[in-house]
Amino acid sequence: MIGSFIRFDLTSWLPRRQTLLLLGFVAVIGILLPVPGMAITGAAIVTSLMIATPFLGDERGRLDTLYGILPVSRSSVVVGRAGSIVVFALLASAIAFAVTVLMASVRGGSLDWGLLLVIQAVAIAFVGLSASIQLPVLFRIGYTRGRLISYAPALLIAGLAWLAQAIGVLDGAQEAATGVPLPLVVGLGLALGAVGIVVGVLVAVPLYRKREL
């Protein structure tokens, strides 16, 4: 049931022009900005902003009402929607990595694979954080009333980074992170991303069950 919903969900919004433009934007970032890793960062931000897009499609196509009468559980809808978002995140990351490698080859530069893996791990953690914040809100109140939540994760990270820089915590954190093994950093990023998505799903399911469609 969940797999079928993921396929249905993806076909309802992934081929749309708005979604394809976002994926194209990821490629443009990697082409125009010479700094390796910027495309990966862009892919994470684009994924975060895109999380609300399927909910917009639900309201425009009255799919949210359809979910209420179909023999599909609310939990299957939540898990399926999270799964389709993960698919988009993987697609955006693949495009970002491919463009990064291609442009490094064209420009004749070398890539720091360790740095790219760290950036990717941080990007995955950010997507997980975004899902944990946005999914409960969007499943509870829908896109129209909850669309501004799309900007919350990026603003939260930017605010925390500014605060850390202002009080000097960021410099100390950078020095402390220098000696941390690469596998640990990558594993931590993957774990945080997975936990964020799981938390978002667990919180969203009971909220969605209470919502009248």
Model regions: which residues?
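Hydrophobic alpha-helical transmembrane segments of membrane proteins
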Residues: 1-62, 80-213
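Active-site phosphate/pyrophosphate-handling residues
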Residues: 65
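Short helix-to-coil transition segments within interhelical loops
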Residues: 68-74
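Alpha-helix N-cap/helix-start motif at helix boundaries, enriched for small hydrophobics
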Residues: 76-78
